[in-house]
UniProtKB/Swiss-Prot annotation:
The keyword Glycosyltransferase does not apply. One of its GO terms (molecular function) is ATP binding. The lineage of its organism: Bacteria, Pseudomonadati, Pseudomonadota, Gammaproteobacteria, Enterobacterales. This is Glutamyl-Q tRNA(Asp) synthetase. L-glutamate binds at residues 35-39, 71, 198, 216. A motif ('KMSKS' region) lies at residues 254-258.
Length: 331
């Protein structure tokens, strides 16, 4: 989860200055476009269903599009077959997307073009600093290589930060303030091993797809500061943001593939969807057992409200964990 020292909620929920109003001051498109962008490092689990369902319901409640993108830019972390199982799970749970699925592994040319543009504008540079050096500095890069004019060989590429984002507005959490060191940091946009950085690929693809609002888990609050800065330096409209509470395991840790969260079951999707709606504190139909999947989701769309969503994460219901584990063999 995001450390309080890095990102903090404002005690005053009003925006204090233009820096925190950056998303809302951008263009206001007529069409809502949301998205769900999982990485194929494992199967979907209850925690990722929360993010998928929340983004889906928000998009459909606005009468907008809901896109799906597979973020497969880190081959060492990918699990064979996970991408197709993720898509199958979304369909099984009734979360049908609009348009074709985009795979980041097929978008390298766009990322290279963006890197070239940033270089031509003097907005990037090569860096050879190691993780251990940055760790010794307290975790934030200090700009050591900024004016060293290093060659490309064996170096990462960093964004030359010109528009630091000290605060941004989240529709659920209100005004969020970033640690100045995080806001001012020249972050990596291409890794030393040649792989494109997550923040670069996300911004390039969201801009390409015309995404107007990003609904995702609260574990991604910290990268939002960097992504908004990159949007601005690339002169792209900045989307609005909603960061949902995280589903936690019994130890209080985020449900994740790294923490061995069980995959979603292949049985009747409605009980798990009901658990997800309860987690988000959404209104439920009185006799949901009598509704088919389509009608259940339609009810959820028609009654979707951000006001009810809790601000903090919560332990996943035991029955949900047991149900997922008992159905593991079906996946």
């Amino acid at each position: 989860m995001v450390q309080q020292a890095v990102i903090q909620r404002s005690a005053n929920q009003q925006l204090s200055n233009q820096r925190s109003a950056n998303q809302r001051a951008t263009n206001q498109p007529t069409e809502y476009v949301g998205r769900f962008a999982p990485s194929p490092s494992g199967d979907l689990h209850f925690g990722s269903l929360i993010a998928a369902l929340g983004s889906y319901l928000q998009a459909r409640a606005q009468g907008g599009k809901w896109l799906v993108r597979i973020e497969d830019i880190d081959p060492p972390r990918e699990v064979p077959g996970a991408a197709s199982r993720i898509l199958a799970a979304l369909e099984h749970y009734g979360l049908h997307w609009d348009g074709p699925v985009i795979y980041q592994s097929q978008r390298h040319e766009a990322y290279r073009a963006t890197l070239n543009w940033l270089e031509q504008q003097g907005l990037s540079y090569y860096c050879t600093c190691t993780r251990s050096r940055i760790h010794q500095l307290g975790g934030f890069y200090d700009g050591y290589c900024r004016d060293r004019h290093l060659p490309a060989s064996g170096a990462a590429i960093r964004l030359r930060q010109t528009q630091p984002v000290y605060a941004f507005y989240d529709k659920l959490l209100g005004e969020l303030h970033a640690h100045p060191a995080l806001a001012q940091e020249d972050f990596i946009i291409r890794r030393r091993d040649g792989l494109f950085a997550y923040n670069l690929a996300v911004v390039v693809d969201d801009a390409f797809q015309g995404v107007t609002e990003i609904v995702r888990g609260a574990d991604l609050i910290e990268p939002t500061v960097r992504q908004i800065a990159l949007y601005q330096q690339l002169q792209h409209p900045v989307p609005s943001y909603i960061h949902l509470p995280l589903a936690l395991n019994n130890q209080g840790n985020k449900l994740s593939k790294q923490n061995h969260a069980p995959p979603l079951p292949n049985g009747d999707p409605r009980p798990i969807l009901i658990d997800a709606l309860k987690f988000l504190r959404q209104p439920l139909p009185e006799y949901w057992q009598d509704l088919d999947l389509y009608l259940l989701l339609r009810y959820a769309v028609e009654h979707w409200t951000l006001v009810s969503i809790p601000l903090q994460g919560a332990i996943t219901p035991q029955k949900t964990q047991r149900h997922s584990q008992s159905k593991h063999g079906e996946l």
